[in-house]
Every structure is written in structure tokens, then in C-alpha cells.
Amino acid sequence: MAFLKKYLLTILMVFLAYYYYSANEKFRPEMLQGKKVIVTGASKGIGREIAYHLAKMGAHVVVTARSKEALQKVVARCLELGAASAHYIAGSMEDMTFAEEFVAEAGNLMGGLDMLILNHVLYNRLTFFHGEIDNVRKSMEVNFHSFVVLSVAAMPMLMQSQGSIAVVSSVAGKITYPLIAPYSASKFALDGFFSTLRSEFLVNKVNVSITLCILGLIDTETAIKATSGIYLGPASPKEECALEIIKGTALRQDEMYYVGSRWVPYLLGNPGRKIMEFLSAAEYNWDNVLSNEKLYGRWA
């Protein structure tokens, strides 16, 4: 667009001002009251704590994981804590058909959807990579492909509610760590896909926020067991982590960080990347792209 280049500096200044202003907006628990929320990977750990926080805030919650028995306990506790409603649907995110059907069923149970929190994860044993392609494939299926499938299935409802997606990721999706190549690859993929999708939403005026949640080591049973005797860094509390995920998503932040050091967000939250992405978008002929819906497609 010609006007974009003509007023590039002005637009960039407004963009940066909005970016920093939004980061200072205050969270209020009542933001979640009555909201309809899906939480994946919710039978234990961070996902379970997210469900409990949402319940205390008066949200409608549908949780999923593989363990039916564990989910039943989570739902019972959510109702005790004050959830407007709570349901579970058990299944595996290795099954893409289940992932797609789960979203539709959850939407029917709640009568819509305001927030999709993608928290499930497949951990691999910490080891050097020696060509175990099956580990890479499984990591990408569960930690990346299923996130995309769930998001696509949820989009009609989220567009109607102008809702939000939380993509729970890791510092290992921003920088490299030895011994976790398949896991790290899936987390880098989340950043690449969902950050690009966010920019496409902006161009297409789709009012659905995407929050990439960058986590360090959290004191979940699974994470501590996987890293015991190998990784010496501190583990942060899962209860507080879960609350920060909800806050960042409710405030529609592009990224939220919950890591052991307060300096990490400043080191990884790269403003230079934001500026470069903005400048690269100015090189597109958006008039041509947006006027040719048949060729380029659009979210309807």
C-alpha cells in the first residue's frame, strides 16, 4: 500500500507506543468471569493449575488429556472452586481426528468459545540426537501439528467471540539447549507458525489474539523427573506460572515470559524483530493480495 510507505515512521511510532502501553494494562480476575475456555493437557501440572485458576474466576471450563480418571478429579475440583461449568473430554493429541472433534464438542458443551489454551506437550528423554526420526515426528505431531489443528477447528467460534489463543511454548523455542533437539524443533515451529498467523490476522482484520507463552523450567512432576540430575537450573512454581499464562492471554499480549531470571524477557523479547517484521510487511502489495481472495484466501 502506498500510504503505508508514505507514513511508515508515523505508523511505526504508533505501533511501538501501543506495544508498550498494552504491556502495562492491568489484569483483573473478572475478565474471565463467564468466559468459555478450553484447556488442553489439563490432567496435571500447569494445565491443571490453569483450570483451577479459571474456576476461581468463574469461567466455563472444558479440560482434556489422556487420563479420564485424572480429568474427573480436575472437573470435580473446578466445580468446588466456583467454575460456572466444568466438563472433560479424554483423548490423545496424537490423534488429529480427536483433536478436531474435541473442539467442536467442547464448543457445544459451553455454547461457544472465548479462549483456547494449548498446553499439552510430549516430552522426549534428554539425550543427544542420533538420528531418531520417530522422536522428531512424534514431537512435531503432538507439540506442533495438533496445536494447528485445534486452532483451525476453534477459529469460527473465536472469530465470533473475538477471543484469544494461548500457545504454551518454551525458552527452548527461542534459544537452543543440548539434549532436546526434537522438543526444541517443535517449540521453534510454534513461534514461526503462530507469530506469522498473528501478522496475517492483523492484515485481515481478524480480531483474535495469539499469546505465545515462553516458559522456563517449571516444577511439574514430569519436568522435574525428566531433568533430574542433568539440568541444574532452578524450577519455577507451576501455580504462579499458570496464573501468568491466564493474565498474558486475557491482556492479549503477543508474548508472555515466565522464567527463572527476570532478565530473560529483556534478552529474548526482541524489539528489533518486531521492527523488522513491521518493515518487511511494508514491502508487500497488500492491495493486490487482499483483492484476490480466490488466489490467496481469507479467514471467513
From Swiss-Prot:
Chain positions recorded as substrate binding sites: S170
Tissue: Widely expressed in all peripheral tissues, with highest expression in liver, followed by kidney and lung, and very low expression in heart, lung, spleen, stomach, small intestine, colon, skin, skeletal muscle, and ovary.
InterPro entries per the UniProt record, alphabetical: 11-beta-HSD, NAD(P)-bd_dom_sf, Sc_DH/Rdtase_CS, SDR_fam
Secretion signal span: none
Ranges of the Lumenal topological domain: 25-300
Segments in the Cytoplasmic topological domain: 1-7
Enzyme Commission code: 1.1.1.146, 1.1.1.201
Keywords: Endoplasmic reticulum, Glycoprotein, Lipid metabolism, Membrane, NADP, Oxidoreductase, Signal-anchor, Steroid metabolism, Transmembrane, Transmembrane helix
Glycosylation sites: N207
Active-site feature positions: Y183
Keyword flag Oxidoreductase: yes
Assigned protein family: Belongs to the short-chain dehydrogenases/reductases (SDR) family.
Subunit structure and binding partners: Homodimer.
Purpose: Controls the reversible conversion of biologically active glucocorticoids such as cortisone to cortisol, and 11-dehydrocorticosterone to corticosterone in the presence of NADP(H). Participates in the corticosteroid receptor-mediated anti-inflammatory response, as well as metabolic and homeostatic processes. Bidirectional in vitro, predominantly functions as a reductase in vivo, thereby increasing the concentration of active glucocorticoids. It has broad substrate specificity, besides glucocorticoids, it accepts other steroid and sterol substrates.
Protein name per its UniProtKB record: 11-beta-hydroxysteroid dehydrogenase 1
Organism encoding this protein: Cavia porcellus
Lineage: Eukaryota, Metazoa, Chordata, Craniata, Vertebrata
